[in-house]
Amino acid sequence: MATSTEETNMTTRNQKDQLAKLMATEDITVVHRKIPTAYFDIKNRILACPIFKEDMSNELYDLFMGHEVGHALYTPYEGVHSALVENKTLKGYLNVVEDVRIERKIRDKFAGLRKSFYKAYNELMENDFFGIKDKDLQTLSLIDKINLITKVGSRVNISLTDEEQVILDKCYACETWEEVEAVAKEIYEWSKENETRDETDESIVPQTLEIGDEEEEDEDGMEEESWGDGDDVEDEEEQSESSKGGSDTEDTMPDLE
């Protein structure tokens, strides 16, 4: 028999699920799974949210849902697919730059999310979600610096060179997917010229945009394990609606444990 707390959590979950559908302006499928990351399948229109061991705050729930709805509204499947067919190693770079664009657009569209996003990122920082507690942030790659600065802002103390600041400003200025792709390619080329990365590098895990119909591992060192298609998830998933769908193209967020 469900406890009052469990019933309250289920009610909140259902309310947030319905809100996500309304925000996305379409009948997307919302599921809850025992997975380490949240993702949105932009091909099959499925939003999956992890089931945390502890209760998820309303603000964190809003961040997860708001971010994924941002991809539902603004990230083009064909654009992502084409870019990765051309160069698979762009995955991490495309993800970070696109996150900047869609989070800005979803906050502009739904101004009430601004406060939730701010509080949720505070919560993530308090739980060392990005794994930076004992890191020298100045030694991070440019793409990881951009990922942190654009998500948590002044909560991290990272200094950029004039050249790096120009690139960051370009990320903030992206309005279209084509601009995202161009800036991601610029960062990728800059990194090849100015940085050394290998499989031992520990990048800061971004909220990742996935193409599940790609099976090969990413060889760029950009957190390969965060690029799976979600098909190996255990059957303990809880689905809030009866809609059908797979998980070919996803956006993921790492777990808080």
Language-model-detected regions and their locations in the chain:
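Short, functionally important secondary-structure microenvironments
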Residues: 1-257
